[in-house]
């Protein structure tokens, strides 16, 4: 057999073998015994019968390092000693934004407006939910640890709900305390050479005072419903614009700049994980007729209105969804760059690798796409420092 899984328990290194045994006809009973000279603890996790032989290729033996005179276990707690070999803050070029806004240079790399030959690659974490809103002491501690890890970017993610005044009738009124915490953290990151990016919509929960036409009379709309509504609803688009306006034209008292003009904000994602080819059906079927009505209008404009095409959810329908998405992206970009004078790069459609999204992604400054490995799980306090 081959080692199919490895891990550790409190005492030692453990593994599971994937083995196969020819048995001929289906037996009434099978007995397995450990080798006589084995001092291991053996168990059978599962078994199955099959007619096909497995191709069990034996991979190269992976090294397993144990504590000894040459290897000492290190428990990481973030408190890297300043100036030590593990302090990577020396590689940061502070403050963030010193070379002007980040641009895409002629070779397709991240660079700077005032130093186009100087490349930068971004490496850093997401801050999610309440992790975006820290008191000043904790913010200082986080920034110190982040710089010593060599991080040069932080993504403010799912920050939108925490920024909203819980007592307001809409989801557009900011909470002054939360805004101050956001401003301070951004400014400290900037001061130490860490660039920021954010999503203008991730999970902001709508309220009755938002006056979204398509949601009138509905008490509890789907949590992420704005993702689907923005491309087809004028009032939803206006709501997105107003949130963006209030955030990006706000002058951070710790930097003296608005977010729209601050080069330390190097990128904005319009709407988090929103490709209509994935989201148009959503969890709430109530919006599906809105897309179907728009699809019929699209077919009529193209001279393709037939019963077969109306029923299709294949290529024509995907082209229709991409057309909606492109129109939405272009309007959002126009608003940000022409009206708000945004200097940051703009991206969107940051989920899935479907080739059908290529035509829409051509309308972005750069492509941001998400892949997940070992996604965090929390036994106690989710997404908190």
Predicted regions: what they are:
Residues 1-126, 132-137, 141-145, 149-152:
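Mature N-terminal, pre-catalytic/accessory segment of carbohydrate-active enzymes
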Residues 42, 99-109, 113-377:
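Active-site mouth of glycoside hydrolases
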Residues 383-385:
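Surface-exposed acidic, glycine/proline-enriched linker/cap segments
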